Structures are given as structure tokens and as C-alpha cells.
């Protein structure tokens, strides 16, 4: 089992201390929020991202296992206007390009405040939206890991693990997989048996609820 920790768990000034602690404990991965590394326009800093990845690997022995908080600071909604959706598509493709420079194989899609649904037709819109992103992710050697967010996150879209599995199977592309959040399963009182026969859909496992 490979272990990683998210860098939103501590402040930036403690990075070096925590990295060393992780190495001592045998951790091999670091999950990052891009704006924790580059505060402004992180996805425009591809060269810097590549350098960060190299330094982290060569000096600490850590790889970037995952990215979270992909849409931090964005106000657009998937199921808002067409222009909002297009803006989010392009922004997410930039995030995927950024992930490629980091050799990161999982982009956590949570973004609860940007994904509230308003009608039954939104499910089909979601299939098209995430299908396009899944295709782009595969072309860049990475994966969108869709995370169920319970209602306490303030969203009404994909609140439980089974709903996300249904979406992934509907999209049916290798670039969209399940980011399994154990905190969500515990909150929803989901039985682990729902994952029987679905292991091939899981790309990443979380033991904490993201905020």
C-alpha cells in the first residue's frame, strides 16, 4: 500500500519539516492543492511545476500522487450557463496539463459549490462534460477521480458513492474513475459491499473528508 498526505494539512512554512517527517515514516506520495504551491494562476506555471516535481523527487523521494481543490476560487457552475460550463472545461484542461508536468495520475474532482444540479437533464449534461474531460485526461496520461460529496458539503449532485459509480459507468471512459472517500462512506453509512465488483473503477482512496 502506498501512502500519501495532502499539503493542505499544514501551513506552507512547515513544508520542509513535514516532507522530512513523511520520508522518515515511509510515505511515498504528496497530494497537493495547486494554489498551495503557486498562489496565483498555478496552471500557467508549467515549467515551474516540472521543476517542483523534480526537486521533490530527487531531494525528498516523494511523488505527486494526486491533486485536489482544482477549482479553488472559481465561481462558475457546471449546470449554470453554457459559457460557465465552457470556462470550467477549459480551466480543467489547464489543470490536466499542469498535472501532466507533475506526473500526477489523479485529479480529485470534488468542487461541491460548483456542481449543484437544477433539473433531471443535468445528468446528461454531466455525462457530456465529464466525458470530454475524461478523454482529455487520458491523452495527458492522467485520470479525473470523481469524489462523492455528501450534503453537508452544500451540494446536491453525486452525494453518495453509488451515484458516482453510476455516472462513471454512464460516461464509460478510462479517464474518469472513482476517488473513493471513506469519510463520505462513513457519513452516509454506506456499506462496503456496494464496492463489490467495482474495484476496477477506483483510482484513489481517501481516508479523510476534503474541505
Regions found by a protein language model. Give the residues of each.
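N-terminal pre-domain/capping segments
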Residues: 1-104, 131, 138, 169, ...
Amino acid at each position: 500500500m502506498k501512502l500519501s498526505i495532502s499539503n493542505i494539512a499544514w501551513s506552507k512554512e512547515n513544508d520542509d519539516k513535514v516532507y522530512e517527517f513523511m520520508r522518515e515514516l515511509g510515505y511515498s506520495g504528496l497530494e497537493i492543492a495547486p494554489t498551495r504551491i503557486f498562489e496565483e494562476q498555478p496552471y500557467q506555471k508549467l515549467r515551474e511545476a516540472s521543476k517542483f516535481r523534480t526537486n521533490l523527487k530527487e531531494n525528498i523521494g516523494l511523488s505527486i500522487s494526486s491533486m485536489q481543490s482544482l477549482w479553488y476560487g472559481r465561481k462558475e457552475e457546471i449546470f449554470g450557463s453554457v459559457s460557465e460550463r465552457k470556462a470550467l472545461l477549459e480551466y480543467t484542461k489547464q489543470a490536466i496539463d499542469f498535472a501532466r508536468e507533475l506526473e500526477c495520475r489523479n485529479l480529485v474532482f470534488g468542487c461541491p459549490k460548483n456542481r449543484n444540479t437544477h433539473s433531471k437533464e443535468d445528468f446528461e449534461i454531466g455525462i457530456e462534460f465529464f466525458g470530454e474531460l475524461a478523454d482529455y485526461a487520458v491523452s495527458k496520461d492522467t485520470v479525473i477521480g470523481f469524489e462523492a460529496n455528501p450534503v453537508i458539503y452544500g451540494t446536491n449532485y453525486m452525494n453518495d458513492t453509488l451515484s458516482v459509480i453510476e455516472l462513471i459507468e454512464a460516461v464509460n471512459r478510462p479517464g474518469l474513475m472513482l476517488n473513493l472517500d471513506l469519510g463520505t462512506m462513513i457519513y452516509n453509512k454506506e456499506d462496503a459491499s456496494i464496492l463489490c465488483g467495482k474495484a476496477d473503477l477506483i483510482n484513489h482512496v481517501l481516508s479523510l473528508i476534503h474541505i
